[in-house]
């Protein structure tokens, strides 16, 4: 938190929080005038792109003086913060005004008076048409001014439209406000994405909030200032109806919903939207920017030019009643009705285990009691638990899951642009355009392409990423002996016995992952074969223990950074492959190069296409979905951690030396996999929500706790078991080598420490996992000698 005093300003209570800044209520100690203090945390601005956004916002606001644009009063800087002293808007934002209408009517005297005099249509979530027109006219006034300055805002949404209390008629006219003097005053805020963009110019940066984003931006096409008009149409619709025009959980679904409507916008009868407002909205919400209403047509529309008059002379407040304009709007509500302190803000922290909070649902812990004692005498050092993995881990995970969750999708119909996604893409863009070599430029159309673009396309190419390089991985050594502990040994013995009792896999398969999902009377068996391209770089060097934490300094070499990033990305890639199995079960798509690790995918009998189109039951979707989300969460954590290291290195070195093509290559790879994993996690979450809605409450509430660590451990041990069998049979030794490498990296991922929280694994757990890594590593070394010997004999 910033100091209690910043220059002449005293800092008060926090009233909002965003991805890079916190907002506080404050006042000038000399004039007693209230202000909003936007304190940007310097440590979160880890690359030039984010700093540039702040600089642009400050430079724009310094020169913008308009009654319907939030004013920048002053700027201050301290050791840890940039402070923007802004005009204080005590009625919060438009989103809060709409969604909390009923509670505000009951508790806020001014809002009570506004809705008493201008009531919403019965049973409608929207606003009275006079209030809507008032806000639209004020928004149009601000946009007309921005237009005159060649500015495009690029993030118009209800959360960025702030409200101030109404003023007297005289003050209203003196300040040159637009609209109706006795209604709240709307002002545009948050110019972090704004750019100077002449009418003939085109931009192509993906920014803004998806629910209000123009389709040309969603399609990753170039766009101009008319993209703001689409956002205005979406906002006007939400004011009139109470919900966004195209509810969606992600970019893909949003674009699909927009295209499905074919410019035919539906309005609920209960909303009683006037024809002139319907006509305005339909003119703004045209998919093709060329068909969309122009700015001049918008400014001249009857809704904008209509002169509003009070419906009566009755004042909004009785003469003996006044409101304290220093109180923020949420302070009028009872504390138990404020479900989230950050309800006005676009917040989701996709850093480290914050990803987990964003994606996972609360679940009850239930241990798997399936135990089948057996012994395989051929395998002495690989007897892990496959059903009761890490009891302590499960307990810790359950404790975390019992805490309140922030949805990845805030509320039901609002899509959040995650902080981590912004940071990841910002750094990747910066490195890509920082002159780091021809290879970086070549990757622009390959690795850096966000997954949504491919996924939303009706035609999919199998060569999407054919030019992507795999990360390179340094040599490390496996410790030969790490003594086991009792924490996991019993559970591991039980699981290994159960696993080794299972029949051997088919021949000529390097790695076979068996997914057994039972749905009452049905059992589905999905087999997935990893091909030999998976983690090929890990099989060219000795697989060993991970590096110790790397302290980033200005003298840290590219090679040191690349080695650490490669270590993390290999772990992430191994876990992502497992998550892909779950995703493919819920969304079986033709295989592309992104999922080329899956050579065969089908049911027991198999099909010519390799896919089983039989619909899954809701309970099965729920099981697969929860496991898939948990695995993508782990993937995002590892990729996020890798990007944090790259960000810190770039922050210290960007001014003194460029990133090497190799480092840029790796960062672009991380960006691509991060975006893809996030999109797929959102897709699975949507499927999961739909499945839960179809289930009986009793079915939905009696579930096992899904722990990513258990899933990863189970699969790593199963891969190792199958590899051992194949090795003993002298069957497909190259594939077996790949299997051992895969299992090692999956186990390594479990040992990756979390820098912000207490590790989920205690010392005993870690030592036991290290023992298995050592054991598998030893078998891998022996196998490689055997392969080399065979190769030499073949050459003779």
Swiss-Prot record:
Topology of this chain in the membrane: Peripheral membrane protein
Pfam families per record: ATG1-like_MIT1 (PF12063), ATG1-like_MIT2 (PF21127), Pkinase (PF00069)
Listed GO biological process terms: autophagosome assembly; autophagy of mitochondrion; filamentous growth; piecemeal microautophagy of the nucleus; protein transport; regulation of autophagy; response to starvation; reticulophagy
Q: Where is this region: Disordered?
A: 360-382, 389-408, 450-480
Main location as per UniProt: cytoplasm
> Where located?
Cytoplasm; Preautophagosomal structure membrane
Compositional bias, Acidic residues, is annotated for: 360-370
All copies of the Protein kinase domain together span: 9-304
User: Which chemical reaction does it catalyze?
Assistant: L-seryl-[protein] + ATP = O-phospho-L-seryl-[protein] + ADP + H(+); L-threonyl-[protein] + ATP = O-phospho-L-threonyl-[protein] + ADP + H(+)
Active site, renumbered = 155
Domain of life of the native organism: Eukaryota
On assembly, the entry states: Homodimer. Forms a ternary complex with ATG13 and ATG17.
Q: What does this protein do?
A: Serine/threonine protein kinase involved in the cytoplasm to vacuole transport (Cvt) and found to be essential in autophagy, where it is required for the formation of autophagosomes. Involved in the clearance of protein aggregates which cannot be efficiently cleared by the proteasome. Required for selective autophagic degradation of the nucleus (nucleophagy) as well as for mitophagy which contributes to regulate mitochondrial quantity and quality by eliminating the mitochondria to a basal level to fulfill cellular energy requirements and preventing excess ROS production.
PANTHER family per UniProt: NON-SPECIFIC SERINE_THREONINE PROTEIN KINASE (PTHR24348:SF22), SERINE/THREONINE-PROTEIN KINASE UNC-51-RELATED (PTHR24348)
Protein family per UniProt: Belongs to the protein kinase superfamily. Ser/Thr protein kinase family. APG1/unc-51/ULK1 subfamily.
The name this protein carries in UniProt is Serine/threonine-protein kinase ATG1
The organism encoding this protein is: Komagataella pastoris (Yeast)
Q: Lineage of the native species?
A: Eukaryota, Fungi, Dikarya, Ascomycota, Saccharomycotina
